[in-house]
UniProtKB/Swiss-Prot annotation:
Quaternary structure and partners: Complex I is composed of 45 different subunits. Interacts with BCAP31.
Protein name: NADH dehydrogenase [ubiquinone] 1 beta subcomplex subunit 11, mitochondrial
Pfam families found in the cross-reference section: ESSS
Function noted in UniProt: Accessory subunit of the mitochondrial membrane respiratory chain NADH dehydrogenase (Complex I), that is believed not to be involved in catalysis. Complex I functions in the transfer of electrons from NADH to the respiratory chain. The immediate electron acceptor for the enzyme is believed to be ubiquinone.
Name of the gene: NDUFB11
Region of interest (Disordered), residue spans: 40-76
Tissue: Ubiquitous.
GO CC terms, sorted: mitochondrial inner membrane; mitochondrion; respiratory chain complex I
Bilayer disposition of the protein: Single-pass membrane protein
Transit peptide stretch: 1-29
């Protein structure tokens, strides 16, 4: 079984080398184990057909290279003056406006999730309760006397 698969893969390898125009060595191999003989196939002598149509230049002109005209091109415009101005505008708005003003905006945002306010409020409430002799924490979050319940029917 294994020798048969090896013979098949050897034939495929020789055929692939022949179709690509690679020189294939004509080899005859005999296995001492199963008496299998591997020889090059008839496909090994065939060459790929030559192209019938001659190669032609591309009739469409290629894009002009902006770097031949303007070696300092930044890729924004064909005109060198507009190219430099567009580059300056992009970098001005990209760096100055977005980075500087954006970071200033983030720095002055209000308290995120009100963490600072809740801490200050808790400290104020603890001071008030200690000053008036009340317990620091109660089991009731709301004053039970102010809660109005519906009447039982």
């Amino acid at each position: 079984m294994a020798a048969g698969l090896f013979g098949l893969s050897a034939r495929r390898l020789l055929a692939a080398a022949a179709t690509r125009g690679l020189p294939a060595a004509r080899v005859r191999w005999e296995s001492s184990f199963s008496r299998t003989v591997v020889a090059p196939s008839a496909v090994a002598g065939k060459r790929p057909p030559e192209p019938t149509t001659p190669w032609q230049e591309d009739p469409e002109p290629e894009d002009e290279n902006l770097y031949e005209k303007n070696p300092d091109s930044h890729g924004y415009d064909k005109d060198p003056v507009l190219d430099v101005w567009n580059m300056r505008l992009v970098f001005f708005f990209g760096v100055s406006i977005i980075l500087v003003l954006g970071s200033t905006f983030v720095a002055y945002l209000p308290d995120y999730r009100m963490k600072e306010w809740s801490r200050r409020e808790a400290e104020r409430l603890v001071k008030y309760r200690e000053a008036n002799g009340l317990p620091i924490m109660e089991s009731n979050c709301f004053d039970p006397s102010k809660i109005q319940l519906p009447e039982d029917e």
